[in-house]
């Protein structure tokens, strides 16, 4: 699992006793959407802020649009098109997917998308922005089989902004709790909010029963031909 491996790696680095370690560069200082425009690679920091990554090529992550954790430094350069010009110290992609449609019933959704326990963790990376819902989630792992995580739309006919997080442990032994990250592209998956902020409700089956939480959500401005890389993980592939 890329996200889990990343977090573990960062934890390991934090135990390094080397006095030369630059701790400001060990941990991520931003959650971004990686985008390209012509021959430029830029990072969408939030709904209004763009960062031109001068030391990154637009073909990073195969030229696909993904959410990512990044550690960057500001530069003194100016740009007429972007809010800031930055130097990327390191960047690591997050599993980035499109939501899936409800099959019409809880039984059908459980058979297709799973009904394993999952927890959503309150964290700075658990956020709805730039047309994405990014989640830090917690689940039981055994390390033997691939897990699947999906966001199901159309679960409430009366509210198109209600979605459901589904986890399929795929028969993996439930030995230990571990955290991971996933980002869902909500653009074209839920109705455009027309510039307004609405409540996006997400529900899930936790170890304490079913839960719900609301996010403030506003559709982003359209971009030309965004390319998604579904299930992309840079360092591991045991979650899809």
State each model region's role.
Residues 1-9:
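Sec-dependent N-terminal signal peptides
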Residues 16-19:
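Bacterial signal peptide processing site
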Residues 25-240:
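First exposed extracellular module after export/assembly in secreted or surface-exposed proteins
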Residues 10-14:
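C-terminal motif of bacterial Sec signal peptides marking the signal peptidase cleavage site
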